[in-house]
Swiss-Prot record:
<dbReference type="InterPro" id="IPR043129">
    <property type="entry name" value="ATPase_NBD"/>
</dbReference>
<keyword id="KW-0479">Metal-binding</keyword>
<keyword id="KW-0408">Iron</keyword>
<keyword id="KW-0819">tRNA processing</keyword>
<feature type="binding site">
    <location>
        <position position="276"/>
    </location>
    <ligand>
        <name>substrate</name>
    </ligand>
</feature>
<dbReference type="Pfam" id="PF00814">
    <property type="entry name" value="TsaD"/>
</dbReference>
<feature type="binding site">
    <location>
        <position position="184"/>
    </location>
    <ligand>
        <name>substrate</name>
    </ligand>
</feature>
<protein>
    <recommendedName>
        <fullName>tRNA N6-adenosine threonylcarbamoyltransferase</fullName>
        <ecNumber>2.3.1.234</ecNumber>
    </recommendedName>
</protein>
<dbReference type="GO" id="GO:0005506">
    <property type="term" value="F:iron ion binding"/>
</dbReference>
<keyword id="KW-0808">Transferase</keyword>
<feature type="binding site">
    <location>
        <position position="171"/>
    </location>
    <ligand>
        <name>substrate</name>
    </ligand>
</feature>
<dbReference type="InterPro" id="IPR022450">
    <property type="entry name" value="TsaD"/>
</dbReference>
<feature type="binding site">
    <location>
        <position position="115"/>
    </location>
    <ligand>
        <name>Fe cation</name>
    </ligand>
</feature>
<keyword id="KW-0012">Acyltransferase</keyword>
<feature type="binding site">
    <location>
        <position position="119"/>
    </location>
    <ligand>
        <name>Fe cation</name>
    </ligand>
</feature>
<dbReference type="InterPro" id="IPR000905">
    <property type="entry name" value="Gcp-like_dom"/>
</dbReference>
<keyword id="KW-0963">Cytoplasm</keyword>
Length: 354
């Protein structure tokens, strides 16, 4: 089954083709992402109406480009998957409308995909994918969650942020220190040059039981340290390093607790912050110490993309799910409410070859 995936939940337009007849990395026939960073930079954040209009402009050309790269005609598609939520309602409707129209014209099934399930399943597109049960850390600009995955589609949220997501904290902290938009990647790059230990910030909510997160207090700590400093380039880098170390260590501590809670030894990390080099290294080290395994998608598939939507959609279409003809989106959507994917798992998609 060749499935077209469309991602338009926020400020990236993503399109991909996933082929279930193949396995591992080659199954992703083609994917392309258009980022709206330049469009929103002057506003210091995403403007929903501008995001929606830009998806309208970019989506169809990106579909044509992706099909060309995959070497496919549009009538060779067997299904269409699109992000149905969570996300910005206008942006979601653009992708959903195009997807439903294509599916109707091609007389193929369509499926709305949960954006965070797409992130969670992205590592399964790699060679030697992880198998349930595992714990997933979903860490991005809008979400920070620990999820127990007992089977594909069977999700239990073990903990989540009570305020800012980790990626949001990166972006806001960077903005406080005068770094350009988008701040998170800029702050991480700056932290590479900072002196470890010069600034040491609290590891929020690690001194008590539980798996929830809170990053708003850490953000305030950094603001006070910045305002009380000489605000030199060197100090900016040192504070960035201290902030990043605090976030990474907090995430690592909570991940290890979650593995103990779920009684498993495999950790999956996905979402934009999952591309952070220091986070990857720290979690790899922690997994090796306990004789476990940590799995990441390739960095290009950590941020929002159509590949994860095509893959998650392929799993659900193979399981016999499909959407009706209505164009529906769900801006707020609890992933735990999704139906299990036992049939898709039995089909072998995303499983190791025997």
């Amino acid at each position: 089954m060749k499935v077209l995936g469309i991602e338009s939940s926020c400020d990236e337009t993503g399109v991909a083709v996933y082929d279930t007849a193949l396995s591992g990395v080659p199954a992703l026939r083609a994917h392309a992402v258009y980022s709206q960073i330049a469009l929103h930079a002057e506003y210091g954040g995403v403007v929903p109406e501008l995001a929606s209009r830009d998806h309208v402009r970019k989506l169809l050309p990106l579909i044509r480009q992706t099909l060309d790269e995959a070497g496919l005609r549009i009538d060779e598609l067997d299904g269409v998957a699109y992000t149905a939520g969570p996300g910005l309602v206008g942006a979601l409707l653009v992708g959903a409308g195009v997807a439903r129209a294509l599916a109707w014209a091609l007389e193929v099934p369509a499926i709305g995909v949960h954006h965070m399930e797409g992130h969670l399943l992205a590592p399964l597109m790699e060679d030697d994918p992880p198998q349930p049960p595992f714990v997933a850390l979903l860490v991005s600009g809008g979400h920070t969650q620990l999820v127990s995955v007992k089977a594909l589609g069977a999700y239990e949220v073990l903990g989540e942020t009570l305020d800012d997501a980790a990626g949001e904290a990166f972006d806001k902290t960077a903005k406080m220190m005068g770094l350009p938009y988008p701040g998170g990647p800029q702050l991480a790059a700056l932290a590479e040059t900072g002196t470890p230990g010069r600034y040491k910030f609290a590891r929020p909510m690690t001194d008590r039981p539980g798996l929830d997160f809170s990053f708003s207090g850490l953000k305030t700590q950094v603001l006070l340290a910045w305002r009380g400093s000489d605000q030199s380039d060197t100090t900016r880098a040192d504070i960035a390093r201290g902030f990043e170390d605090a976030v990474v260590e907090t995430l690592a501590i909570k991940c290890l607790r979650a593995l103990d809670t779920a009684d498993c030894n495999t950790l999956v990390v996905a979402g934009g912050v999952g591309a952070n080099k220091r986070l990857r290294a720290r979690l790899q080290e922690a997994a090796q110490r306990r004789g476990g395994r940590v799995c990441f998608p390739r960095p290009a598939l950590c941020t929002d993309n159509g590949a994860m939507i095509a893959f998650a959609g392929a799993l659900r279409l193979e399981a016999g799910e499909h959407a009706d003809a209505a164009v529906q989106v769900t801006p707020r959507w609890d992933m735990a409410s999704l139906p299990p994917l036992a049939a898709a798992r039995e089909s072998g998609i995303g499983n190791r070859e025997s």
